[in-house]
Amino acid sequence: MKEFPMCPDCAKEYYDPATRRYDAQPVCCNECGPEVYLIGREERGRDAIIYTRRTIAEGGIVAIKGIGGFHLCCDATNEEAVKRLRELKKRPAKPFAVMAKDLESVKKECLVSEEQEKILTGHQKPILLLDKKEDGEETLCESIAPGNPKVGVMLPYAPVQLLLLSLIHISE
């Protein structure tokens, strides 16, 4: 956390043994902590999240820095966006995984057993290969997993992903 020097209020809590944040490395607040921003743009914080979400909704592709590196993201219901992502990645047929907002969203498209539900919602947040419902809402485009009866699904595991997905239905 060297890159984020603490403000006086956070430093006070960090060095006071009587507080719950005593000697906790990630102590920070909106004044001194990390922030969400876009490279090459002025938006910060919530505005950056809204701009990114709008870009995805309009068929754009964005790179999102997460815990384990970068991942490319587009709207999995937009056939043209997914095809463009396939071209960029030079990945003509290998299935893509999708990130769903929540378990309810997954269940609209896929069959989910109790065991799969536990795995999907567990703390590890793996990509789980699930059977597509024959009578599902079919909002995912075919290009996600061409000719495949299964789709790789995961739930958000990083704060930035949760923020992006929480704004899906917010009127902008």
Language model regions located:
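Cys/His-rich short segments
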Residues: 1-45
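Glycine/threonine-rich flexible loop motifs
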Residues: 18, 71-75, 154
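Gly-rich Lys/Arg/Thr-decorated short loops/hinges at beta-loop-alpha junctions or inter-strand turns
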Residues: 31-38, 65, 140-148
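Structural motif
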Residues: 35-37, 60-63, 95-98, 126-127, ...
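A short, well-structured juxtamembrane/interface segment
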Residues: 45-56
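Glycine-rich N-terminal segment of FAD-binding domains in flavoprotein oxidoreductases
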Residues: 56-58, 62-70, 74
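A phosphate-binding glycine/aspartate-rich beta-alpha loop in the early core of alpha/beta enzymes
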Residues: 69-139, 143, 148
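Residue-level detector of conserved catalytic or cofactor/ligand-binding positions
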Residues: 165-172
